[in-house]
């Protein structure tokens, strides 16, 4: 893009846990979806990684806010501040003036008109001149390398931070889908609850996330067992420091109730799939995307439950962002993009 380029094109995966921005086919921003605001002055103290480092460690003057909950905007003002700040992180590449922004943003497939409007308004207030929307399962399918326009059935399960999106896709459209509010954030809460109830220890959200990444599992028996994860925190009864060694077996137990809900949602969508498309899915398998796809043994668990092979998309954390980037390059071709 030259010095006088009038438009900058951005693909944005506005996630509950992380926001990823793609420009010119490259990931230019990958930050936690969180802002830190000064309560007295209203000044933005930090956005993204710096704000996450403050999360759970602030004093009363500074508040950290996660603007999205369950995949949708929960705090409009904070969402706008965050989006504006993250867009500023995208380099202007030597342009002489700020270009107008063309954006494609992904949204949960179960979004209401009000929720879609909130995303659009946030994007426009943050500088978006042309704003398009794409449903997350469609973006996940594109990011997983599937031909979404083909006359055959493809199925994706995208387990993000706020929602799990399950969809059957054919001929550039979503044939049937289900969106449930059981995903990464709920897994994190499950871990906090388990450690509190079973080990009498309080841990914060960040520590629970670290446990999830290190030893989070969907099966109590794995072929490759990860090393136990050590945690330090206060004992609830004594307030004295204690050290725990957490195994993946424990985490499989802690997450079981939530995983059963995801199992059920997948079965519900499979029941809705027309027979001809079902045959395609049984042959091609189902694709897993999102951070939840990284739970150890999840693909095997789901394959055993459904008798259908499950494939983890390449770099599942960024699959939705990649797909949104592909949609951005093909705005005029893909009829499923919404204005």
Question: Where on the chain are the PLM-derived regions?
Answer:
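Nucleotide/phosphate-binding catalytic cleft detector across ATP-hydrolyzing
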Residues: 1-159, 167-286, 293-339
């Amino acid at each position: 893009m030259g010095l006088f380029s009038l438009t900058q094109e951005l693909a944005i995966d506005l996630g509950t846990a992380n926001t990823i921005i793609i420009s010119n086919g490259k990931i230019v921003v990958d930050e936690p979806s969180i802002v830190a605001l000064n309560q007295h002055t209203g000044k933005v103290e930090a956005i993204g990684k710096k704000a996450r480092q403050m999360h759970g460690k602030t004093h009363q003057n500074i508040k950290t806010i996660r603007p999205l909950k369950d995949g949708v905007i929960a705090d409009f003002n904070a969402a706008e501040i965050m989006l504006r700040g993250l867009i500023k992180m995208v380099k202007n590449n030597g342009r002489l003036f700020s270009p107008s922004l063309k954006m494609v943003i992904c949204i949960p497939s179960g979004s209401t008109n009000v929720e879609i409007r909130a995303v659009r308004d946030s994007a426009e207030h943050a500088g978006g001149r042309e704003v398009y929307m794409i449903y997350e399962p469609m973006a996940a399918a594109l990011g997983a390398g599937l031909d979404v326009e083909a006359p055959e059935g493809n199925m994706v399960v995208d387990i993000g931070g706020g929602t799990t999106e399950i969809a059957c896709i054919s001929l550039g459209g979503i044939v049937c889908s289900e969106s449930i509010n059981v995903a990464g954030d709920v897994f994190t809460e499950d871990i906090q609850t388990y450690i509190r109830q079973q080990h009498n220890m309080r841990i914060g959200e960040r520590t629970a996330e670290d446990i999830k990444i290190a030893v989070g599992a969907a099966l109590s028996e794995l072929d490759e067992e990860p090393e136990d994860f050590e945690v330090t925190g206060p004992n609830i009864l004594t307030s004295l420091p204690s050290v725990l060694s957490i195994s993946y077996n424990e985490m499989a137990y802690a997450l079981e109730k939530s995983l059963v809900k995801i199992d059920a949602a997948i079965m519900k969508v499979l029941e809705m799939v027309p027979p001809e498309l079902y045959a395609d899915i049984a042959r091609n398998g189902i694709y897993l995307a999102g951070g939840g796809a990284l739970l150890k043994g999840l693909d095997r668990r789901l394959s055993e439950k459904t008798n259908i092979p499950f494939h983890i998309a390449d770099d599942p954390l960024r699959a939705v962002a990649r797909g949104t980037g592909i949609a951005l390059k093909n705005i005029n071709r893909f009829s499923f993009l919404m204005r």
